[in-house]
Design a protein with these regions (language model features):
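Intrinsic disorder at enzyme termini
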Residues: 1-8
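Glycine-rich phosphate/cofactor-binding loops in nucleotide/flavin-utilizing enzymes
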Residues: 2, 13-17, 28, 69, ...
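Residue-level signal for inorganic ion chemistry
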Residues: 9, 20, 74, 103, ...
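Short secondary-structure junction/hinge motifs that connect adjacent elements
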Residues: 27-49
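Internal helix-loop-helix
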Residues: 49-108, 112-118, 158-165
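A short, Trp-centered hydrophobic/proline-enriched beta-strand micro-motif
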Residues: 117-125
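A short core secondary-structure module
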Residues: 124, 147, 151-175
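A structural signal for short hydrophobic beta-strand segments in well-ordered beta-sheet cores
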Residues: 139-142
Length: 175
C-alpha cells in the first residue's frame, strides 16, 4: 500500500504552503482576527481560484472529485498558519451536508456558489446548555407551506456575521 501523496496532492500542498507562508504571518493574522470582518475575502477568492473550495466536490457538481486525503492536505496547511477563512463551515460542513443529503435542486443552487467562493455558510448547531450534544436539540422546525418555521435559540454561531447562508439544526418531530 502506497501512503505517499499523489503528484496533484503535492502540488496543492506546495501551493497552499506558499500562500499560508506569504499571507499568514503572526502580525497579519492578529490584524485580520482583530478586524471587523475577522477574515479576508480576497484570500477566500484566491482559494476559489486555486480550486481549493471545489476540491471535495464531484466533477458532476463542478468540483475536482477529491477525497479525505485531499481535505487532510488542505487542513494540515491551514492549521500551520491558523487560517481563519470559513473553509470548515462552508466547504466541509455545508458542502458535506449538501453532497450527502441535499436534493438535486439544493445542490444545483448552492454547490457552484461554494466552489466559486460567492457563498459562505455558518453552522448553527450549539444550543444554550446543550454542551455540544447534537442529540440535545430543542430548536424545532414546523412545515409551513413550501418552507419551515424555526422556533428556538442557538448559542454562538461562529461566522454568522459574514455568512451568506446558515445551516440550522432543528427537530422536525419527536422529543
Amino acid at each position: 500500500m502506497d501512503f505517499n501523496f499523489t503528484e496533484e496532492q503535492e502540488m496543492v500542498r506546495d501551493g497552499l504552503s506558499r500562500l499560508v507562508r506569504e499571507e499568514y504571518g503572526a502580525e497579519t493574522r492578529r490584524e485580520v482576527i482583530g478586524s471587523e470582518a475577522g477574515w479576508r475575502p480576497e484570500i477566500w477568492s484566491q482559494l476559489a481560484e486555486l480550486g481549493i473550495l471545489g476540491m471535495p466536490f464531484s466533477e458532476d457538481d463542478g468540483g475536482f472529485g477529491g477525497g479525505a486525503v485531499d481535505a487532510m492536505v488542505v487542513m494540515e496547511e491551514f492549521g500551520k498558519g491558523l487560517v481563519v477563512e470559513p473553509f470548515v463551515p462552508t466547504v466541509v460542513c455545508a458542502g458535506g451536508f449538501l453532497k450527502h443529503a441535499g436534493t438535486t435542486a439544493q445542490k444545483e443552487e448552492h454547490i457552484s456558489g461554494i466552489i466559486d467562493g460567492s457563498r459562505v455558510f455558518a453552522f448553527a448547531y450549539a444550543e444554550p446548555g446543550g454542551r455540544y450534544d447534537l442529540a440535545d436539540l430543542q430548536t424545532t422546525a414546523k412545515q409551513d407551506g413550501d418552507g419551515y418555521v424555526l422556533n428556538g435559540h442557538k448559542a454562538v454561531v461562529i461566522g454568522a456575521p459574514w455568512a451568506s447562508h446558515l445551516i440550522v439544526t432543528a427537530r422536525t418531530g419527536g422529543d
